[in-house]
Amino acid sequence: MSHAFDKPVLHDVTISSTGELVVLVGASGSGKTTCARIAAGLIEADTGHATIDARLVCPGDVGMCFQRPQDQLFAQSVAEDIAFGPNNKGFSPDDVEALVAYAAARVGLDQQVMGASPLTLSGGQARRAALAGTLACATYAVVFDEATSGLDGEARSQVLHLARELANEGKAVLAITHDVSEWLPFADRVVFLEKGRVVADVNVQEAQTNPEIYEAAQLDCPLFVSVLHELLEACYV
């Protein structure tokens, strides 16, 4: 797919991720967020399109977890926020209630938090509420857009493990990040984007051991990647 605003942002980007956790990494301005929004059905590509199992993606098919939980929390109560997506899909009241209960239980939201205003939540509670809203919408796929940025260790771990679990359950999972290190233990593949183009689409092992990929994507190479590369080179000398 390709997309342009005042100038081209994406050029012939293809990412397949059914049942996988694919990490899309790139520097600021590389086109990551545009790719995420197309994948979630929020905007249309100028050429090409987003599909899941050959089916065109609609906004209601994909749950999207944004960097800022506040961008997903705007109703009078957390329960209403979680129900927003299923209600918009036209689900029956019973189905909406079941989805809200499932999503809340999965991220550990109790009844007190469910009845609270989003404005009163702590940072960790807000992230869990946003995750629950994402889960309630995630019919086929989930997009995490810088969803671990600024989180403490516990909240970050919850996001990462949830993403892995969703992929294991057969959903397509796309994680957008500028820092690939924390996602590598959970990922199946890593796609490196630079100036709107895919410069590498590799398995996790290669992303952990090949510094040249990071150079091609104009990214700082994580120290552990350089160390592993040197160790492997030494083993083959």
Language-model features: locations:
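Catalytic Walker B motif of ABC-type/P-loop ATPase nucleotide-binding domains
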Residues: 142-145
